[in-house]
């Protein structure tokens, strides 16, 4: 009874969670009955702890509603259920265009070593400085880091391919190298390759020129893990897409891990064949968003600590509130502050930072104003600027207005009452409600999440 109800339980979870959350945390689970106990198997400790902390109450509540006092005890365990017993997986409830295997086969990491192309070493370009330990986690990148950690622990498993997308300088490349370092740590003989998509194109062109295309194919199809950054640069390169299509298929058929990154959601990449874009979404697709204020502060504090600099909290918040677009911009600004402090011997204060970053701060303040946000959002949603300030409450107008209010709260230093005044004299509680509503919708709606990220990129560029 409890095992059969598990299907209904995961259906409820699928309704309540985002597609990313369901695919990452619920989909890998397996269950079986042991006496009056329902054992929930997670693939690793990370998933087990997350599900128990975040979703145990929902699961308990469901079984209590359905079975009352007969509800089973719940126990979590790591691994798979004994193979001789019946199995129910969460994959039964998820809708996917790709058939999902009942059994995950880990790559053997024993593939014969192919002849290298252009004297390339299989993993010479995995940067050992990029680790999970020095990746600053926040709400904006939490899912991406969690997925990457699971891939590092179980390459070729549930999240294959893993597709990370988001603007430049948000940490996608850091995560690729961290996964590579994790795989190599667990499997020193693993053949892990990281590269920019242009390198793949260059290798293919060189192979064609040297009549070595078969060696090229053997090399790329022999790796245990292939990580390609900025896959959007394959756009309009038909021969490269053709070769990558077959490489992709060969690696997935062998349960070898693929991770791709892009600045866009897979289906939005122009100039790439539909059959490739479809395959990009076969595994797990995760957005990496611009870091929120707390994460930006943490990044600055971590970077300062690594540089041996004592950065006052108020200075970190001052910089983080004004530079919002990406991690590289933050680190570049901090490097400039540190260099100026070392050169002048002056203490790092807010006034000192104002002086050291005066051109950068002036540019940011000039670019991001409430008026600019309103115009950008109105143009994006194809509504009139007058509607943004009007009392109209139709969803086609109210939702863009709420988005603009939330962006104004995040991207400017204006107070809630000041933002309300700029939106037709609205009360600060209206602005607060809009901010909370958009935050909720960004968790629940892929479209709103994409719109918000696109607008931040536009306003911060």
Curated annotation (Swiss-Prot):
The keyword Cytoplasm applies. One of its GO terms (biological process) is DNA replication initiation. The keyword Transport does not apply. Gene3D superfamilies: 1.10.1750.10, 1.10.8.60, 3.30.300.180, P-loop containing nucleotide triphosphate hydrolases (3.40.50.300). The lineage of its organism: Bacteria, Pseudomonadati, Pseudomonadota, Gammaproteobacteria, Alteromonadales. Residues 125-341 are annotated as: Domain III, AAA+ region. This is Chromosomal replication initiator protein DnaA. Belongs to the DnaA family. Oligomerizes as a right-handed, spiral filament on DNA at oriC. It is found in: Cytoplasm. Coiled coil: none annotated. Pfam families: Bac_DnaA, Bac_DnaA_C, DnaA_N, Hda_lid. Residues 87-124 are annotated as: Domain II. It comes from Shewanella halifaxensis (strain HAW-EB4). Disulfide bonds: none annotated.
């Amino acid at each position: 009874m409890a095992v059969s109800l598990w299907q209904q339980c995961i259906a409820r979870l699928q309704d309540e969670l985002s597609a990313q959350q369901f695919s990452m945390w619920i989909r890998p689970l397996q269950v079986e009955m042991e006496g009056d106990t329902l054992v929930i198997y997670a693939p690793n400790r990370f998933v087990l702890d997350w599900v128990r902390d975040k979703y145990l109450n929902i699961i308990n509540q469901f079984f209590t509603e359905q079975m009352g006092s007969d509800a089973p005890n719940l126990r979590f365990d790591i691994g798979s259920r004994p193979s001789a017993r019946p199995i129910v997986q969460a994959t039964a409830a998820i809708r996917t265009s790709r058939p999902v295997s009942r059994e995950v086969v880990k790559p053997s990491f024993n593939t014969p070593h192919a002849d290298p192309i252009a004297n390339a070493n299989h993993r010479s370009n995995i940067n050992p400085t990029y680790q999970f330990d020095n990746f600053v986690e926040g709400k904006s990148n939490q899912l991406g880091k969690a997925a990457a950690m699971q891939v590092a622990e179980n390459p070729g498993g549930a999240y294959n391919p893993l597709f990370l997308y988001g603007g430049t300088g948000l940490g996608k490349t850091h995560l690729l190298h961290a996964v590579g370092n994790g795989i190599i740590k667990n499997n020193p003989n693993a053949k892990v390759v990281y590269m920019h998509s242009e390198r793949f194109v260059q290798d293919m062109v060189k192979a064609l020129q040297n009549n070595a295309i078969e060696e090229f194919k053997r090399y790329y199809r022999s790796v245990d893990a292939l990580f390609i950054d900025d896959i959007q640069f394959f756009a309009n390169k038909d021969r490269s897409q053709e070769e990558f299509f077959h490489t992709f298929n060969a690696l997935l058929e062998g349960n070898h891990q693929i991770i791709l990154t892009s600045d866009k959601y897979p289906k939005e990449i122009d100039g790439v064949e539909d059959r490739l874009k479809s395959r990009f979404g076969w595994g797990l697709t995760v957005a990496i968003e611009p870091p929120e204020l707390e994460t930006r502060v943490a990044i600055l504090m971590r970077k300062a600590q690594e540089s041996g600099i004592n950065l006052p909290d108020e200075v970190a918040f001052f910089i983080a509130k004004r530079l919002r677009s990406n991690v590289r911009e933050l680190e570049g600004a901090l490097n400039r502050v540190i260099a100026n402090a070392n050169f002048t011997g002056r203490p790092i204060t807010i006034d000192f930072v104002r002086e050291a970053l005066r051109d950068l701060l002036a540019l940011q303040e000039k670019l991001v104003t409430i008026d600019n946000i309103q115009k950008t959002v109105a143009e994006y949603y194809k509504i009139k600027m007058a509607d943004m300030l009007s009392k109209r409450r139709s969803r086609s107008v109210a939702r863009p207005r709420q988005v603009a209010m939330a962006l104004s709260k995040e991207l400017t230093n204006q107070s809630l009452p000041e933002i309300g005044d700029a939106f037709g004299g609205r009360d600060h509680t209206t602005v607060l409600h809009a901010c909370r509503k958009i935050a909720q919708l960004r968790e629940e709606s892929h479209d709103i999440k994409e719109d918000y990220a696109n607008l931040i990129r536009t306003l911060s560029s």
